[in-house]
Each structure stands twice: as C-alpha cells, then as structure tokens.
Amino acid sequence: MNVGPRVLIVDDHPSFRASARVLLESEGFDVVGEAEDGASAIAEASRLQPEIVLLDVQLPDTDGFDVAAQITAATGHVPAVILVSSRDSSDFGPLVSRCGAMGFVPKAELSGERLQELLA
C-alpha cells in the first residue's frame, strides 16, 4: 500500500491517465482517483481531498486554468495543483501562476522527481 502524497489525475486521455498512474505509483505516490473532464475533476477533488491534483490544461468541457481555480474554491482545502500539457509552458505564460497552480510539467517530462521539485 502506498503512503506517499494522495494524487488525483485529471486528463481526457485514458492512456495518459493509465501511464501517469503507473509512473507515480512506482515512485511512491498514492493515486486515489482519476477524472476525465473539469466537472468530474471538481467533484472528485471535493470527495477525495487529494494533496495533489495533476491537471491537464486542455479538457473537453473547460480548461485546466479554470478548473484549478474552481477546485480550490469548491473543496474547502487547497490541494497542490500541477498543470500538465503536451505543449510547452511558454505557451501559457503567467496563466499557470494566476490560476493558483503550483507549477507546470510537460507531459513528456512527468516524473515523481519533477512533482517533488514543484512541491518543495
């Protein structure tokens, strides 16, 4: 049983959710749930109370920047939101910090070490 930080993975691509789960669990994180869109992300974050929300920037019903702000407002606690995208962080400029996210990681560079660096 994992005892690391509790993580909610939010992405509309099942293959990314599955690979992120395997990667994070192998590095000691406790993946407590998954969501495929903004509405379910907000509901799951409220229900599961994760310490970290790994949140895709592009979701089918909204964008990750809006979801990040809503999760903080809706859950009553402040999980560390880490945005991910297949695009480079330079595409998003100051939007990452404005939405309350702890940081950004390109999907190709996702690792437990990168998450720990952002959380430090």
Pin down the residues of each PLM region:
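Acidic catalytic/metal-coordinating carboxylates
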Residues: D37-S40, D63-D66
